[in-house]
Design a protein with these regions (language model features):
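Nuclease-adjacent, charged terminal/linker segments that flank catalytic cores
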Residues: 1-81
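Non-catalytic C-terminal interaction segments of nucleic acid-processing enzymes
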Residues: 8, 141, 154-165, 169-233
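Hydrophobic, Leu/Ile/Phe/Ala-enriched alpha-helical segments that form helix-helix packing faces
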Residues: 15, 31, 35, 97-105, ...
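Active-site metal-binding core of divalent-cation-utilizing nuclease and nuclease-like domains
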Residues: 43-44, 84-89, 98-146, 152-156
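Short aromatic-enriched loop/helix-cap "lid" or pocket-rim segments at secondary-structure transitions
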Residues: 67-68, 123, 189-191
Length: 233
């Protein structure tokens, strides 16, 4: 549910990493039963991913909210699935970042967007934005806490102006890490976030599978200085 959308391969990887399921055959059998009983929905969206894509269904939401006490803030019928796949590819990209950090064994905690939205609805100390995630990593003998934003497509200048205004009002976090989906998006983020009055770091999402999180190259949007993630102040 907290992934919003997830490919069948991503779902298997999440389940295997958490130790909930070690047999792929058993896993597919369980997924098929959940689908047959209306707890999840399966979608084919080749414009977003070649794999089938799953989302929580209304029956699954009711069970998790009423029987498990899982916080939820979204459509009662579950996530909207548009035929053009809008929003799906972004969610799948966030999943890949999450999986990369899980595999690195540096991930201490991951607060997802749904949990953040629920917190922002009721908490006295709210985040300035509904981030994609709030992440804690164990790097170089210390724990690094930051908001994570995955930027897959460019936004209009007015939208970046609005985001800058929100980030500069953030009082509960010291750092925001933007991971760009492409080098072009990374360059655009450097331009749009330059001299922001908040510690915003910009990196490339595709670097994560190739390097340890500690060695991820990031740029400080205030100063344009380049750091390894482990070395940021």
């Amino acid at each position: 549910m907290y992934c919003t959308y997830v490919t069948q391969t991503q779902l298997w990887q999440f389940m295997r990493h958490s130790g909930y399921e070690l047999s792929r055959g058993s896993f597919w059998w369980r997924v098929k039963r959940l689908e047959d009983h209306g707890f999840i929905t399966r979608h084919s969206l080749p414009m977003a991913h070649r794999d089938p894509i799953f989302a929580i269904a209304s029956s699954g939401l009711v069970y998790l909210v009423e029987n498990v006490g899982t916080p939820y803030n979204g459509p009662e019928a579950g996530p909207d699935i548009r035929v053009d796949g809008v929003g799906v590819a972004h969610a799948l990209g966030v999943n890949e970042v999450h999986l990369d950090l899980l595999r690195s064994r540096a991930l201490v905690s991951w607060e997802n967007e749904m949990e953040i939205r629920c917190r922002n609805e009721v908490a006295d100390t709210k985040y300035a934005k509904d981030y994609d995630a709030i992440v804690t990593l164990a790097l170089g003998g210390r724990q690094l806490l930051f908001a994570l934003e995955y930027e897959r497509t460019p936004k209009a200048q007015t939208e970046y102006d609005r985001i800058v205004s929100m980030l500069e009002r953030e009082r509960n976090l010291d750092r925001v890490l933007y991971l760009a989906g492409t080098r072009h998006i990374r360059s655009l983020l450097k331009q749009r976030l330059w001299r922001i009055r908040q510690r915003v770091l910009i990196g490339l999402a595709s670097d994560l599978p190739k390097t340890e999180p500690a060695d991820l190259e990031v740029v400080d949007a205030q100063t344009m200085q380049v750091y390894r993630l482990v070395d940021i102040p």
